[in-house]
């Protein structure tokens, strides 16, 4: 069973301002802080978010700390996470329950 708390979309939307969320939906990740904000918006730990995205925690940390930048398909997945956080949360919950 997943230890992710159930939050409404409205509660999730309060985590980051709508102006920042709009930039993220457009794939405008100006800094590692934007990716960290998105992860917090989705409501997952680094390990959970990395698993849901199909990347290593090391890669996610590099993005969040600004050492590397997501490209191509990773940006598309980040946009999906910004638009549909519940889908990402459901994905990780199903992965964790299957383990």
Regions found by a protein language model. Give the residues of each.
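Recognition helix of helix-turn-helix/homeodomain-like DNA-binding domains
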Residues: 55-70
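N-terminal flexible/basic segments that precede or flank functional cores
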Residues: 1-29, 87-99
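Conserved hydrophobic/aromatic packing and binding residues within compact polymer-binding modules
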Residues: 35, 49-50, 60-63
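Short amphipathic alpha-helix starts
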Residues: 49, 53-58, 78
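N-terminal positioning helix adjacent to the helix-turn-helix/winged-helix DNA-binding module
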Residues: 31-34, 73
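DNA major-groove recognition helix of helix-turn-helix/homeodomain DNA-binding modules
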Residues: 73-90
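Short basic helix-loop element that most often maps to the first helix and adjoining turn
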Residues: 34-48
């Amino acid at each position: 069973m997943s230890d992710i708390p159930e939050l409404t979309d409205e509660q999730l939307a309060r985590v980051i301002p709508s102006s920042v969320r709009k930039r993220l939906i457009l794939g405008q990740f100006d800094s590692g802080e934007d990716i960290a904000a998105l992860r917090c918006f989705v409501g997952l730990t680094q390990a959970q978010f990395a698993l849901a995205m199909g990347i290593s925690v090391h890669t996610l940390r590099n993005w969040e700390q600004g050492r590397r930048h997501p490209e191509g398909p990773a940006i598309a997945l980040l946009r999906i996470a910004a638009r549909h956080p519940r889908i990402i949360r459901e994905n990780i919950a199903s992965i964790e329950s299957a383990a």
